[in-house]
Swiss-Prot record:
This is Histidinol dehydrogenase. One of its GO terms (molecular function) is NAD binding. Its EC number is 1.1.1.23. Transmembrane segments: none annotated. Its cofactor is Zn(2+).
Amino acid sequence: MQTIIWNHLSETEKRKVIMRPVQQNGENIQQAVNAIRENVAYNGDRALFELCEKFDGVKLDKLIVSADEIQAASSRISVKLRNAIEQAKTNIEAFHKAQQNQEIDLEIQEGVRCQVVTRPISCVGLYIPGGSAPLFSTVLMLAIPAKIAGCKKIVLCSPPPISDEILYTAHLCGVETIYAIGGAQAVFAMAQGTESVAKVDKIFGPGNAFVTEAKRQVAQNSTAIDMPAGPSEVLVIADESADPEFVASDLLSQAEHGADSQVILVATCETLAKETALAIERQLALLPRAETARKALNHSRIFIAESLEQAVEISNEYAPEHLIVQTKNARKLLPYLDNAGSIFLGAYSPESMGDYASGTNHVLPTYGYTKTYSSLGLADFSKRMTVQELTPKGFKNLAETVEVMAEAEQLAAHKMAVSVRLAKLNI
């Protein structure tokens, strides 16, 4: 990791050094995803079977995972892992239940009643990546709030063969239907519907560049998505009180996600920065994914800030997905931290806790989107509607205000909708 003293940079250099690596979602990916979209649209299930064999190397005779298969998978999960998943589920449920909205019902003025009511999104689709490290924890993060929100139908897609852990966790969380479909084709199947796959209203979940591009495309039509996605990232603010071994482990826990991940340390102490760099090398030697982590470290940075105030400014400008604060009084910085997906305060709040079991959601905006997007929560699985109800007296008292405004905007029909009612009231 390159170490840079922040105050030695010009304003132009500062903007440049906190830029993320360019995402390689080029024309080739877009063209490939376009072809998959058209194939699924025209050929439905047949396309899904063909693409599964082509990309996953699995020849399926059905797309829906049977209850017997789910039961068999669940029986192979160790008691130790079951207990861990159930503990995480309990914590995540508690935190997301606390997010349930109180409905707003106000009399704004006499005879004018306004409300906000919340309704669940009817049908949601969850995408869970497969591969050598199945992300069953993401099932918890998506299915639990969907269930609490009251979504009527929850379906899940994951590339075959689906891991036992994913099947067990999905069943535990009440997912009704599981499809053995992966990649961009899964996104298009859920967005468009096929003979076997239910069309959904909103799609959630992470994925590779092809899945991300597919989600971008469906979001331009009639299917909503959770949020824009990019490579995973973490920024750590640390002062002289921080433990370099802790800081190094937090940086590496993010770097091991992928070669395109980025990790940033903003330290107010050069000694800590040097000790952390040495600790990273020691810990790297112990990691199975050391090669991946090292690639991520190649485009990561250590910034030396003159103060915690400056460290906060750097963090707010970078707007990280994960923000870890390892300082003497971490909570004192919280009021000044504006842009982050999830914040981890103190030496004993590693990102791993939020990734799995503290209760917060690990589905977070990346690539600077935390300036405008929030971490996933219960609200993402529901929608708000406003309601207004006026009595004749309330209508009469507000009528002139609306007529004047409608006339000023030259919308005669808007004014007429008020005038005809006033006439009926014999005013």
